[in-house]
Curated annotation (Swiss-Prot):
Residues 1-179, 198-220, 246-290 are annotated as: Disordered. One of its GO terms (cellular component) is nucleus. One of its GO terms (biological process) is response to antibiotic. Residues 14-24, 78-118 have a biased composition (Basic residues). This is Serine/Arginine-related protein 53. Plays a role in pre-mRNA splicing. Involved in both constitutive and alternative pre-mRNA splicing. May have a role in the recognition of the 3' splice site during the second step of splicing. Residues 265-278 have a biased composition (Low complexity). Interacts (via Arg/Ser-rich domain) with LUC7L3, RBM39 and RSF1. It comes from the Eukaryota. It comes from Mus musculus (Mouse). Residues 1-13, 44-62, 132-166, 198-218, 247-256 have a biased composition (Basic and acidic residues).
Amino acid sequence: MGRRSSDTEEESRSKRKKKHRRRSSSSSSSDSRTYSRKKGGRRPRSDSRSWSRDRQLRSHSYERRRRRRSSSSSSYGSRRKRSRSRSRGRGKPYRVQRSRSKSRTRRSRSRPRPRSHSRSSERSSHRRTRSRSRDRDRRKVRDKEKREKEKDKGKDKEVHSIKRGDSGNIKAGLEHLPPAEQAKARLQLVLEAAAKADEALKAKERSEEEAKRRKEEDQATLVEQVKRVKEIEAIESDSFVQQTFRSSKDVKKAVEPSEVQHVTAASGPASAAAEPPSTGKEIDPDSIPTAIKYQDDNSLAHPNLFIEKAEAEEKWFKRLIALRQERLMGSPVA
């Protein structure tokens, strides 16, 4: 009996402990629920503001990610449309997009912010347009070069085809003729080709002669220039002495007949008999004028004006004959 009573007491105690534990756990859970309700029922203003800011930042970060994904996944056409719309509305301010939240309260709370990727996208679009314009210019230059090369090739082909066509036409034209006429026609063609070759050679020789002549003229001018420079240097030097001017024309004329006289004296009478007598008049050195002589007749007009008409015409006729002889023979007029 004593053992049974002790067992029952222990069982009752364990049951009481279990009930007490259950009650304590339920009370703690109810207390936590009530505390959480109290806590969630009213919040201080600072906590609500920080919570709204966190939500705004999260919404903005989500918007940025979504825009980046859409811009990266968009096609070439959408990029082009976007660049056109930006270029049209450059002067206008950028449209402000609000955060697309589900509730209206959150939408009203969110602040408007401009696009963050607008400047970078504009720069990239400018770079693209520049690179495209450069590519277009390069393509145009390449196309022009290709066209010029094709034109040159076409001209060369035309020249070769014309030459071949000429030879073919000649052969075709000579086929229906008899052999004698064919030989004559071929001879004529050969003569024409030889004449053309002679003309080309003559033109070449003329060009070479002209080049030589120009070279000689350049050399002569160089010699004259050097002589002139030396004369100028001699005049400018300190050892230069001024002298009176003497004409070399009269001196040459006087020297020539004196040389002729010396030659005739040395050759003897045989050479004098063999040679015909000279028709020219011998000029004495005493007769050469050395000073200017003035004729003061106290007359207002020249004496040639008082000559008769027939005498003046005869003198003029003689002068014309002398000038004609000078032009034809090259001898100076006395």
